Amino acid sequence: MTKPVADTSAVLTSEDTLVLASMGSPVEMQLIMDWLGEQRARTPGAKFDVLKLPPRNAPTAALTALVEQLESGSEAGADRSIVPVQVFWQPPADRSRLAKVAGLLPGRDPYHPNPRQQRRILRSDPQRARVMAGESATVSELRKQWRDNTVGEDQHDFAHFVARRAILALARAEYRILGPQYKSPRLVKPEMLASARFRAGLEKIPGATVEEAGKMLDELATGWSQASVDVFSVLGRLISRGFDPEFDYDEYQVAAMRTALEAHPAVLLFSHRSYIDGAVVPVAMQDNRLPPVHMFGGVNLSFGVMGPLMRRAGMIFIRRNIAGDPLYKYVLKEYVGYVVEKRFNLSWSIEGTRSRTGKMLPPKLGLMSYVADAYLDGRSDDILLQGVSICFDQLHEIAEYAAYARGAEKTPEGFSWLYNFIKAQGERNYGKIYVRFPEAVSMRQYLGVPHGPITHDLAAKRLALQKMSFEVAWRILRATPMTATGLVCALLLTARGTALTLGQLHHTLQDSLDYLERKQTPMSTSALRLRSREGVRAAVDALSNAHPVTRVDSGREPVWYIAPEDELAAAFYRNSVIHAFLETSIVELALAHARHAEGDRMAAFWDQVMRLRDLLKFDFYFADSAAFRANIAEEMAWHRDWESQVAAGGDQIDAILYAKRPLISDAMLRVFFEAYAIVADVLRDAPANIKQKDLTDLALGLGRQYVAQARVRSSEPVSTLLFATARQVVDDQHLIEPAPDLTERRSAFLAELRNILRDFDYVGKIARNRFVARELKARQERLEQQAQ
């Protein structure tokens, strides 16, 4: 038989060694015995015993031989070395996608070939067979670990423990060969159920049993396999096949994250705009040969063949509504702690669900609290919260989001849904997927040392969790590149259905690009190309055919506009870039407010800045108050002597607004205040404690009336998604609960919102005047050129 390649680590050095050999076929047995013969020849005086490694669920009787070996030699045998070995079968290099999918079929797993395939491999490609040894340990070391960490009572329990340790050591040796992207926890259920720590906590839960806890661990377990990891990466590429095949990364960020992950376990918290995100993160880790993530997902996604496949690729499905199930909460908490302790990485959406508006939702803290508990309990000296920004040039799901905003029901997940979802990805090209990894947040920095004072201070811990989560979200936003899609849609939405020429689009976009460059905002390739007319043409053409732009090219030159029925879809893209213009938009509105204020206009300016921040806090992320004020001052510092101009008011403030580039608040923020105003108008004659559904239904009805009467600029603010946030705003203003002056305060709030909308009108008028003046100048220049 042709000899296999021996792993350099597969050398026995101890004088007394028990080899636990994982041998699943006569071929593997022969390979290992040949290898053992080489070891004996290398060290003639050493004692090498070999025993077949018991399977993971071996009955007690199958452990008798191992028990005898562990007990042999009494005290002298305590320092006997235990070395696990197995034959590792290297998959063929450069396998096709079809071959990877075929690896799931019975008898086709390249990592575990059947005996016939093994013999063929040794004849044709013996380099693919490798005798691999796991890390060794002495009997005394293993016995101490067993006594310290488990509830085992007899020698058969100890033998079970040794067998599990051998399997885990072989798994570690295997992923060192394959690469970190195949790293995954093994034997989680038996390890946890045997843990003294786990059993002690279980005893504190009334009625809890080991059997029931075991069933819950089966539900959480990933059932990981190498072939499933390969297939899931193929599935990820299939789901995202409508995009460019290569994801767009920042290589410096990838290198920094690789270094960080070598030191500490991490939770990868990704922004969530599409179901594709769940496939993007694992593929991104594989692309960059980074350790895999074990992603939490709702049990609603565990359907058909997808459930088992995703489990084996590292997906952890969790139940919903677990507040009334203390045993499940405990098992989930301990499961998270175990995975973190073993230095595996977790992942989920920081927003908890897809953002159907395009802007980032507030972070959810549920799972984060379990990770914090694991850290505070000393499971790791630090845990990194690694943000992941995922953005797209385009998404096919925006049509669904627009329908949902109008009141449609969510489509339930299932096999037919998945088929249609994957099918839709091939309908056209959606551009690029951009993946960014901003600097990670240290849990230790916010929670202090493990077992520290914050451990038992629930209020302090929750506050720290909120600060951590918001910091991660803030870093995600700052790392998210601007896309041409978002910038173009923002511009066309302000035109309110009026078509623009290529020249108008190109010229108007330059102010925004100048601002983003000045602020050193990350830019996508598509956004950078907007500097040229060709880049603008490529961007609007990609969005044409109502995706969501309409092109008219039957005249002298093509023009582009957004039809009323496509405004909600376009708003999704516009909303994805608002965060970059949020502070400068607030500056414009505060200037318009101060322009018409009496008395101290500087005070009026700053008061309105902070008031607008307070009203928008449920829709957008802001820096803390001090940093926010500093950012606003920095925005104004671009205008010389701005404070005296604001204090003077009138024409002096107008001069600032006319000089400001870009003038963009009307494009970015108006729709949110229109939605707030619709809800506030509904509240004028609504009862106290009105239910959210009733408020939304009334707002949809009144909003449609507003659209028909042209009391709002478009149909965009008539959205269940925006009304949900508006409900939070009015609740924060204490306009829902009963009070003696409720009617007066509701009317006052509506009046305040209408004043803000008048400020939008004022800024918008200046922006339009400037646009018209520029167009007239450009036309005059063209006429002069023609006359020459």
UniProtKB/Swiss-Prot annotation:
Record's keyword terms, sorted: Acyltransferase, Cell membrane, Lipid biosynthesis, Lipid metabolism, Membrane, Phospholipid biosynthesis, Phospholipid metabolism, Transferase
Leading EC class: transferase
Cited Pfam families: Acyltransferase (PF01553), GPAT_C (PF19277)
- Quote the subcellular location field of this record: Cell membrane
This entry carries the following GO cellular component terms, namely: plasma membrane
Q: Where is this motif: HXXXXD motif?
A: 271-276
**Gene Ontology molecular function:** glycerol-3-phosphate O-acyltransferase activity
Where is it chiefly localized?
Answer: membrane
Q: Which reaction does it catalyse?
A: sn-glycerol 3-phosphate + an acyl-CoA = a 1-acyl-sn-glycero-3-phosphate + CoA
EC number(s) of the enzyme?
2.3.1.15
What membrane topology is annotated for this entry?
Peripheral membrane protein
Which InterPro entries does the record associate with it?
GPAT/DHAPAT (IPR022284), GPAT/DHAPAT_C (IPR045520), GPAT/DHAPAT_LPLAT (IPR041728), GPAT_PlsB (IPR028354), Plipid/glycerol_acylTrfase (IPR002123)
- What family name appears in the similarity comment? Belongs to the GPAT/DAPAT family.
**Record note on domains:** The HXXXXD motif is essential for acyltransferase activity and may constitute the binding site for the phosphate moiety of the glycerol-3-phosphate.
Q: What is this protein called?
A: Glycerol-3-phosphate acyltransferase
Tell me the organism: Mycobacterium marinum (strain ATCC BAA-535 / M)
Gene that specifies this protein: plsB
